[in-house]
Design a protein with these regions (language model features):
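Charge-rich (acidic/polar
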Residues: 1-152
Length: 152
């Protein structure tokens, strides 16, 4: 959050003191500095953790930072569409891991969820192109969940 606070302060100062192209350039510079800092931190953080944790534990930390959305989403898709192939499951997992990496860098919970939302849309498009009727799959899934006493 410090990275975002620095960016916000610079943007606020630029908007209060500059005009025109100078203001736009200062705002863009603040965004670029934020992106560069996030890029560094994104790789420094797991590297520092690796001194004390193994890969599985680092993934658990990443999942904690992103509210466990990766596995909830993956398990939901696998439960919703029991006929998914191993290839389809692997593609879904790959996209969700990518989403988690972006979500880790997001500045708040809404933006973390938005990162996953983008990839959920990508997954839905992928599955639809592969011939799955997602509306029908969701309806059948809801029936199965209800039959076993659960809720969605």
């Amino acid at each position: 959050n410090d990275i975002y606070e620095v960016r916000d302060a610079k943007v606020k100062q630029a908007k209060e003191t500059l005009t025109g192209d100078a203001k736009q350039a200062a705002v863009k510079a603040a965004e670029d500095e934020k992106d560069a800092a996030l890029y560094r931190c994104h790789f420094e953080f797991p590297a520092a953790l690796s001194l004390y944790l193994d890969g599985k534990q680092i993934d658990a930390v990443k999942d904690g930072m992103t509210y466990g959305v990766l596995m909830v989403t993956y398990n939901s898709h696998v439960d919703m569409i029991p006929t998914l192939t191993q290839e389809e499951k692997a593609q879904i997992m790959a996209w969700l891991v990518e989403a988690r990496e972006f979500a880790m860098d997001a500045e708040n919970s809404n933006k973390k969820h938005a990162a996953f939302g983008k990839y959920k849309g990508r997954i839905n498009n992928y599955l639809a192109k592969r011939g799955y009727n997602l509306t029908k799959e969701r309806e059948e899934w809801a029936k199965r969940v209800k039959a076993r006493g659960g809720t969605l």
